[in-house]
Amino acid sequence: MSSLARTHHKPAVMPPELLDREAPGSDPAHHSEAAHLAAQAIVRRGRSGVAPDILDRLIKLADSDGLIELAELWSTSPAVSLPGTLWRLYVLRRAVMNDADRWSALFRAGKSVDDVTVVVAGVADPPGPAEMVEVTTAILTGAYTGDFAVALERAAAFCRVIAAGQAAHADSAEAHAAHHARSLTESSRRLAATASDLLSSADMWRRNHLE
């Protein structure tokens, strides 16, 4: 995931590659401290056996205009950090919710990436729009109620399949829509990088180094 244009103030337009955002300017040290403290507090709250209604509110933090607040707090955090990782999980779910049909088409196109990755992603078959929302919600839920590293590995696998789907669509579009094909290829590259970042975060979490 690399920096994209500032579109987080328009949450209805959410392509699969929208997983990095540039937050408004502020004191970098203060902003970083606030981002990390907020991420730590949210993770502690979610993993402390909270009531179902509180867990539901945590899962839906990025719903509606909440994405803007999260972007201002977390979007400039390093990819392999607790706030940067949470940002990616929330944006992944929000992006899917806003265009589940597109994501399901990309997932179907990318299922050939490899059997293990598809299994780890854990998407029900056939992978329709409802299944896309279900899996990204389950990933966030698992981050709070299960093994955090496993949730990140599942998110990484999901991103890898989508990236493969984007690459497949790019190949199909090359002959008649070269510009669109290049855009898909770049999106695929960014999402594959996101998957790698999530795996690195999972490893850091297991070693108690994800902060």
Give the positions of each predicted feature:
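Arginine residue identity/basic-tract feature
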Residues: 6, 21, 44-47, 57, ...
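Acidic-enriched, low-complexity/disordered segments with a strong bias for Aspartate over Glutamate
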Residues: 20, 27, 53-56, 63-65, ...
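N-terminal domain-start signal
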Residues: 1-94
